[in-house]
Regions:
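Polar-ligand-bearing catalytic/cofactor-coordination segments
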Residues: 4-107, 141-183
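Post-HExxH zinc-binding segment in Zn-dependent metallohydrolases
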Residues: 102-125
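Hydrophobic alpha-helical segments of small multi-pass membrane proteins
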Residues: 107-110, 133-140
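Hydrophobic alpha-helical transmembrane segments
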Residues: 125-135
Length: 183
C-alpha cells in the first residue's frame, strides 16, 4: 500500500543518516534497558532487515543485521522501539500481556478459522461454524490490539530517546518519522 511504501521510505532515508553521537542500535538498546532498570533482557542479533523484535517469553531483544551495528538514526529508532516493548513487558502493560495471550488463538484462528466456518456451513454443522468464527474473531482481535501496543512502544521510545539525550533535536525529528513507521 501507499502507507507501507511511505513508511519504508522514511526508514530507508534515515538509514543513510548517521547519528552525531555515533551510537549503534545495540548500544542504544543496551543503554535504554539499563536506565529503565531492565537487567534481565539479553540483546541478540537476527538475520535480515527489519526483523527486529522483543521476545517476552525468552526475554531477548533481537536486532536485525540492519540495526545491530548501524549508527543510523533509523537503527537507533528501531532499537528504541523494541526497547519500548521490553519496557511494556517489565511494567506489565496490559494490552501487551493480553495480545501475547492471543498469539496461539491468532495463529490458529487466521489459518483454520475460515476453513472451519466454511466446513461447518457446508456440512450444516452450526457448532463447527461457530468455532471457526470465534477462532477467526480471535485473530482479528489480535491485530486490533496490536496497533495500540505498537503506538505505545513508539511513544515510549520517543520519550526515552528525548529524556536520555541520545539524539540531537534535529535527529529526533527524523526518528519520530521512523517510529511512526515502526508502529
Amino acid at each position: 500500500t501507499r502507507e507501507t511504501r511511505c513508511s519504508l521510505d522514511f526508514i530507508a532515508k534515515y538509514s543513510k543518516k548517521m547519528s552525531q553521537r555515533n551510537i549503534t542500535g545495540t548500544q542504544a538498546a543496551a543503554y535504554l534497558l539499563k536506565v529503565n532498570g531492565i537487567t534481565d533482557v539479553k540483546l541478540g542479533r537476527i538475520k535480515g532487515n527489519l526483523t527486529d523484535h522483543f521476545s517476552p517469553s525468552e526475554k531477548v531483544l533481537r536486532l536485525s543485521d540492519s540495526t545491530f551495528d548501524s549508527t543510523s538514526i533509523a537503527a537507533i529508532g528501531v532499537a528504541a522501539h523494541e526497547t519500548g516493548h521490553a519496557i511494556q513487558h517489565a511494567k506489565k502493560y496490559f494490552p501487551l500481556t493480553f495480545r501475547n495471550m492471543l498469539v496461539p488463538v491468532a495463529n490458529i484462528g487466521s489459518s483454520a478459522g475460515p476453513w472451519l466456518a466454511i466446513l461447518g456451513i457446508a456440512m450444516s454443522f452450526p457448532i463447527l461454524t461457530d468455532i471457526g468464527i470465534l477462532l477467526f474473531a480471535g485473530s482479528v482481535a489480535f491485530y486490533v490490539i496490536t496497533l495500540p501496543v505498537e503506538f505505545n512502544a513508539s511513544n515510549r521510545a520517543r520519550k526515552i530517546l528525548e529524556q536520555n539525550n541520545i539524539l540531537s533535536a534535529e535527529e529526533l525529528k527524523g526518528v519520530k518519522k521512523v517510529l511512526s513507521a515502526a508502529a
